[in-house]
Every structure is written in C-alpha cells, then in structure tokens.
C-alpha cells in the first residue's frame, strides 16, 4: 500500500506538471517541483533534530515509569478491554499501558509527549508481530486511532485565532470536539469492520459507556465556561498535566527504590536509537508530498470540487476552507499555513475561516503519522491502515463542515 501510494504521488505530480507546461505554458513548474524535493529533504532533517531531543527526553521518563510499575498497572486495569480489541496482545503486556498514555497525551494536546510514547507503544506491539514488514491488526488499530486526531483541548487552534485578532478565540471549541469525535468513531468502526472486532461485547461496552459519559460530562462542564476562562483552563490544564506526569513518574519511581537518574539515561539512549532510524522514511514521504503540492495537483482538485458544488446548487462557502483539508493529511505545517491564509483573506471569524479552523483541529497529518510510526519499526506493508485512516480523515472533514453549518449557519 505505501509503495503504491508513494509512487502514485510522483505520477500524479508528473501528470499535473505536464498539463501545466503543455497547456498552460508554465515552464517553471518543474523548477518549483525540484526545489520542493530539496526543501523537503532539508525539512526532514530539521524535524529529526526536534525528534531527537523530544524522543530522548520522553523515553527517558518512560523508562522510569516502566521500572516503577506504572505501565504494568495500566496494562492490568485495561487488559480485559484490549483483550477484545487487540486479541493478539496478551493481558498485562506493557504495550497496553503505553497505548493508554499515548491516547491521554493526544487528548490533552501534549504532542511532544504523545509521539515518543506512541513510538514506544508501536515498538512494543512489533515485538508481538510475527512479520517484520507487515503491519499487525493491533498496530493498525493503534495507528488509525492516532491518525483520527484524538483531541479534547485544541489549544493551538485558539492560539492561531487569537494571533489573527479573533474576539473569541475559543469559538470553535465545541465544533472541534464534535468533529474530532466523528473522525475517531469512524476510524474505530472502520478498523472494527475490517478486523471483525466484537464492538458490542459486554466487556467493551462496560469500558466505553462510562468513558463516553465522563467525556460528555467534561464537555458539558467546559461548555458552561466563558471564552476567557476556557482559554485559561486549556493552557493551565495542559502544562500542569505535562509537568504533573513527569513528577508522578519520578515520585513513584523514588518510592519504589528505582534509581531514577540511571533509568532516565538508559531510556534516553533508546530514544536516540529510535530517532535515527526514522530519517529515511521521513525523507521519502515528505519529498513525495512536497512534489505533489508543488505540482499544482491539489489546486486542480479544489477547482473541480468548487465546480461540482456549484453544479449541484449547494452553498459554496465551505469550499474556501478546503485547502486546509486537502493538505492536512500530507503536511501539518502546510495546513497551518492554509488556515492562516484563509483567516487573513476571508476574515478570522468568516465562515470559511471557522470551517478551516475546525478542520485543522479535528484532523491529523495521516501520512506523517504513517511514516513516523511504521518507519520506527520497519513496517512496509500497511494493509488496511491507510484506507481506514483516510476514511477517519474524511469523516473529520465532513463532520467539521456539517457542525460549522449547524453552529454558524
């Protein structure tokens, strides 16, 4: 799947460039594509520099958590649930605790913590994988849920809106929560269908129903807060949770006689080893994405959608937000640039800008996630992971558009 996808990016880019050259007379398109290849190669190295530090830091703290028994405790608590969703993962396996920590970090918007924990989890799952290069069912479910954008506190979206002068930066908070719920639910159900998981098992429902009620109560509580209070809570909760997690690892580790410094250094060394293996996969995927963007293929797609919507007689206001949706699976920085451009062009509280902000907060950089997570363990055949992840992405986009029409007309 990844092989065909990667090759397809280059073929589509080449066809698009030829059309622009032969029909539109744009001879500079090839220079732009070549420039993009080298720019993406440079960007890959810059991303790796950041990942080296982040992975080294968090895998160090995670080693303390492992030796303190925190990960093992989480694995025991959630063992019955994962036994049904990931049957190939034995009860009490460390991967269960790591997956739980990863989902919690993602939900709170702690990306710097979530990625290293996620890479540790995918490596733990790889130990159970009978194949060195083919993704297992458990790895696919984990990756698709990661790619579905598990977000409860989209602090960065609030920041972008505040920077552009929005009087109420948190206006899109509830729309983002609803849209990201759509993407996560669809991603989960898609994988459940492909893998024939027993979603209606009483044990699964015993975990999911209280979790859904707790989430609903949390959302209802947040909905009663003012914009100022909500923004303040988002910032405080994220930072306090992050530092509190570090202190929890250290205190429990010290109480259980773990040599925390030595454990940290031991884990940090592993982080360095994980990071250096990612570079070839990042270069491959980011260069292909860069060529596709520079070729103008995404612009062709956007124009086609606009004409189709007009032909159907539907409202076209949301179309101006689609550049963010079209590039988000490929590049988070490009989607961020598209969002800011939409805010500046249409106005920060215009309908297209609100839709774009909701899309940005409820979708994920699917191909980056694929490259990083599967690249870390050498997976080359993703099976149904790409299809399910993109379906979740589509659900997030459609959910964002629908919710914004509901909230903002």
What are these regions (language model features)?
Residues 1-53, 159-292, 311, 384-409:
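Signature of multi-pass transmembrane helix bundles
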Residues 11, 58, 67, 107, ...:
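Short glycine/serine/threonine-biased micro-segments
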Residues 30-127, 256-345:
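Membrane-embedded alpha-helical segments and adjacent helix-loop junctions characteristic
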Residues 38, 45, 94-96, 131-139, ...:
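Hydrophobic alpha-helical segments, principally membrane-spanning helices and signal/leader peptides
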Residues 100, 104, 139, 230-233, ...:
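Generic signal for short, ordered secondary-structure residues
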Residues 113-114, 121-162, 166-196, 322-409:
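C-terminal transmembrane helix pair
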